[in-house]
Curated annotation (Swiss-Prot):
Residues that coordinate or bind ATP: 10-17
SMART domains: GuKc
Keywords assigned: ATP-binding, Cytoplasm, Kinase, Nucleotide-binding, Transferase
Family according to the record: Belongs to the guanylate kinase family.
Predominant cellular place of this UniProt entry's protein: cytoplasm
Domain Guanylate kinase-like: 3-183
Name this polypeptide is given: Guanylate kinase
EC number assigned by the record: 2.7.4.8
Amino acid sequence: MQGFVLLISGPSGAGKSTLLKKLFDEFEDELYFSISSTTRKPREGEKNGIHYHFISHEEFQKGIDSDHFLEWARVHENFYGTSLKHTQNALDNGKIVVFDIDVQGFKIARKKMADKIVSVFITTKNKDELKKRLIKRNTDTIIQLEKRLQNASDEMKELSEYDYLIINDELKQSYEALRAILIAHKFRTKGQNLGQIQNIWNEGE
């Protein structure tokens, strides 16, 4: 099987990380999580090389100049980017590469490898629910919270650009939807070596 990209977007606080953790718990051997590089400072509990590659603005700019990134974007005054080389190596090894990136990054990545991307937008049932989750998380100032909500409203305008939409209201139901999307795309003819399969089939005559 040829690898493909499972690209996840959605507002901060929509529950993407929780759903992806469940996905990796079940499909660990088949998945490769693309670890983004970022210029923001680590949050409590985050480790370099596990959650993100934390780099300086100067290092990030060098990556842009050398075409190191498959996609990159500026989010909340910081930069985030995904390594093109690491992504391609994982795809060549038949892995399902998981991206958790914003709408800006999705549009850039799609231009470079549209035929390999399956895109899913995950959000809450409404803006009030998202606000409750962000307040409960208690990691943002009031100004940061309002900016996240505005960014979420802007991203919601891009829903039609994505292949699938999951309203993450009930965790179990949302996970089953994400799981079904992954499984279905594993068996697409588009991603398989049909010539080899046909040869093996004919040899069995």
